[in-house]
Regions:
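PLP-dependent enzyme catalytic core of the Aspartate aminotransferase-like
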Residues: 129-132, 138-185
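Short acidic/glycine-enriched loop/turn segments that link adjacent beta-strands
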Residues: 11, 112, 156-159
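Active-site PLP attachment segment
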Residues: 1-40
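Structural motif of enzymes handling amino- and sulfur-group chemistry
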Residues: 39-95, 114
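Alpha-helical structural signal in soluble globular domains
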Residues: 66, 92, 96, 100, ...
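Glycine- and other small-residue-rich loops at beta-strand/loop junctions that grip anionic moieties
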Residues: 6, 53, 166
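Conserved PLP-binding catalytic core of the aspartate aminotransferase-like
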Residues: 83-91, 100-143
């Protein structure tokens, strides 16, 4: 899946989902307009279910060539450089947070793209409802205007935070987050 509005600064609604052919029979959309019972012809059930899920506006997809070309001009980097920039920023952000919270990174840097998940220490893991917003997430958002996913998970048990890096992020934002996390945990 590619969320193009986040990673390409494209309009919302331009995301796509790729599924390996051998797994397509296991994946179904949340809403099926008419593809469930349509005769297949030369197509697959996967295509019938996903290709037409109802009324849609394709204009977000139509502007993608413009977005791709103009974002590189705007920042003066090609796409390979943008990807490298975001990856390096995510790695630096993870290091800043891990160092501040005295956490060993859960995986080597080569496994990081532009998103990094960090297991944070918490005495509350067993007390947090999996189906409710994590209190730390709420506190970060309401008290500090920080929007970052925080959740608890039963296996492997722990409380996690996920950071992402994009051209509009800066290292000092990860330092700010690390300082706030240190205060809140």
């Amino acid at each position: 899946m590619c969320i193009r509005d986040r990673w390409l600064c494209a309009p919302k609604g331009s995301a796509f989902l790729h599924v390996r052919k051998d797994l397509q029979n296991l994946i179904h959309p949340l809403t099926i307009s008419h593809g469930m019972t349509t005769p297949l012809g030369n197509s697959t059930r996967f295509r019938h279910e996903f290709d037409w899920t109802g009324t849609r506006d394709v204009s977000a997809w139509c502007v993608l060539p413009f977005v791709i070309e103009n974002l590189t001009k705007l920042v003066g980097m090609n796409w390979s450089e943008i990807i490298t920039h975001n990856r390096n920023l995510a790695i630096r952000g993870r290091k800043i947070i891990c160092k501040k919270l005295n956490i060993v990174p859960p995986c080597p840097d080569y496994m990081i793209s532009s998103i990094a998940t960090i297991k944070i220490s918490s005495n509350q893991v067993n007390e947090i409802d999996l189906y409710e917003p994590d209190p730390l997430h709420v506190k970060l958002l309401e008290d500090y205007d920080i929007q970052v996913p925080v959740w608890s998970w039963p296996n492997p048990q722990g409380r996690y935070i996920r950071i992402s890096a994009q051209l509009y992020n800066y290292e000092d934002e990860y330092e700010y987050l690390a300082n706030i996390l240190e205060k809140c945990l």
